[in-house]
Structures are given as C-alpha cells and as structure tokens.
C-alpha cells in the first residue's frame, strides 16, 4: 500500500468521521450533565433538510449552517421541555423525538429531494497540505471540517479545564449536591441539551452541504444511533470520542480501501461494517456493565426535580 493511497484513506476517514464527531461531542456534553437524549438521528435529519433548503433558496451556505443548528436546537428545546420540564422518561422522549424528526424532515424535504447544490469546497492550505501522509487529511479539507477541529478543541478545553466543565459534570454526577451548592441544575441540563441539539443540527448540515451537497430522505443513515454508541464506547471521554469517530469513519470507507488494494470482497458486505462494529461494541460493553457504569455519569437518564 503506497503513501498516496494511505493519504487518500486518511483524507476520506476524516470526511466520513466528521458528522459522527460533531453529533457525538454534543451528546457527550448532554450525557455528562445527566441527560440521555436518543433523538440525535431526528435532530440531524431536521438540521440537514433545514440547512439544505435555506442554502439552496438563499445561495448562502453559512446561513444554511446557522439555521440548521437552530433547527437542531428547536427540536432539543422540545425534548428539554418534555423530559426536564415535565420530568418525562428520557428514553421514551428521545425515541419519540427521533420518530418526529425523521417524519418532519421527510415531509418538509419532499419537494427538495435530488436538487443539486454547490456545497462547501475543500480549502487547501499551501505547504502544509503537502506534508506526506497527513497533509491532505488535516490541511486540504472544507471549512466545516476545520470548524469541527476547532469545536473539538473548544469542547475538550471547556470540559477538562474550566469551571463550566466542572459544573456540567457535577450536575451529572450528583444533582442534589449540586443544587445544595447553589448550582442551577435544570438550567445547566437545559443548556447542555440545547448544545447537543445545535451540534446534531451542524452534523446534519455537514452531510447536506459538504459531504454530499444534496437532500435525500434518511441521508443520515443511522449516524445518530452510531454516535450514541460511540459516546459509550469512548467512556464519556472527549479524546476517545475523537478517536472513535474517525475509527467508525474508517470502517465506513473500508470497501473503498478494499478496492484500492485489489480485494474482491462484495462492497455491500463491507458497507455493513460500521453497523456491525456498533453492535460488536455494544455487546462487548454489555459483558462488563460494572466497568461501563464506573465511567458513566451517575445520574445519567434519571429524572430530577428541585426538592425531590
């Protein structure tokens, strides 16, 4: 396998892993606050269709990105109102949100299926993009991928080095103690949910405005569910989220790698690998639930109200 082929593989790995990275970062912050939102797939799809329609209608890709994030936040507000405001079951609410988001995106985007759009183009950084092996992977990507690098660094810094990160984690570990210390538990959790919605909307916008600049029904292809498994796989650790996202991205393009090295394996079989990998990860984690619980936020998925 020559260096040019490896460079192309790493380049494609980052492209395919970026939507997983974005949505998983948002979900990780949400879960760190103690809230389990299973509505990622629906929010991604609604963000994707909103971003595409806005960008197609106005010719402004960045306006599409911003309104895609707003669309994801809108659905996450609905989740927060039901799950946090009315203390509803978070799992059931998240599943309902996914069903609602999938149906809403299909309805809204029915007239826009297959329409062409000039999306974000790669921005090549001179000299740096010529670095062997990693040059194209890091310095010849589109602006949304560069934005994902910045957002990853920002989330890592906030969660690991700032008081805000400590507050989010305190709320997720022991909301009663956090409340007794004067921390606004419900407000922190609501903001974490909204951040997760914005990141899911951004991931959807990346799919419809950069990765494959078009709108197609169910174009997320289960990435929201994979991201949920990815957060558990990463043990709620931000750097492992980055690694896991790109590993799943690599699994998504393994059929192209096989073609590049001349392996005659059916492409449909290889295309199943990301989903098989998700199942394998969940099975392996379920074999050691005690270890998984050690890393999970203690109050994850548990309803909480002041004074209860």
Q: Where do the model's predicted regions map?
A:
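Hydrophobic core segments of alpha-helical transmembrane domains in multi-pass membrane transport
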Residues: 23-24, 48-52, 102-106, 147-157, ...
